[in-house]
Amino acid sequence: MTMVVCGDFEPEKILDEIKKRLIKKENQGEIKRIYPQKEKEINMPYKESKMEVSMPAFMVGYKDVQGEEYNPRIAVKKHIAIEILLNMIIGKSSNLYKELYEKGIILSEPGLDYEFTYQYAHILISGQSNNPQEIQKRIKETVKTFRENGLNEQHFDRIRKKVYGDYAIEYNSVGNIARMFLADNMKGINSFDYIDDYKTVTKQYVEEILKDIFKEENMVLSIVK
């Protein structure tokens, strides 16, 4: 069990109250979970569902496979690199997003996320559009250009600072701190590692992650319309 308490309080008093309410049980020892081996290949590249929606919703995904030995520090560094890449590819300040928005292909800034645990990991780009296939096509083209030509130094530095700022802002909210610490703890991560590891994320490392994960054979498109 994990408990996170954030706010203006005296730690000693909170700990005393928690201890009063804990039920004493014998130590059952460490629980070792055995998970099935995940396939590296995607299940299906395209899926379409029919629902009553005013505008088609889409999700473009990239499958990432965790190594046999999950390393929290490596996961943190990779997470930062992917956040930078997603913002460079189709974030609000990217050329691709501006073009898609001006042409009315995408309605608003897409959701960008990288979800990972001990067993699985994937990248998600989500939003609403009357032409999700065109968005997927343009993402492929942008990724291909980045892979072939490398990342623009100035663009990379600007987005890198933006991502760091996003992390720092999280600490302005007590609720965000609690959510962040709880989620990271379940992955074996110290939330402060993000601030420390940010300094080690170089343009070269981000380009390696781009080539390793953003592959067309790992890409899927799901549409609800």
Please place each PLM-identified region on the residue numbering.
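Charge-rich, well-structured scaffold segments of protease-associated domains
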Residues: 1-31, 72-73, 86, 93, ...
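An aromatic/glycine/proline-enriched structural segment found at the starts
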Residues: 2-68
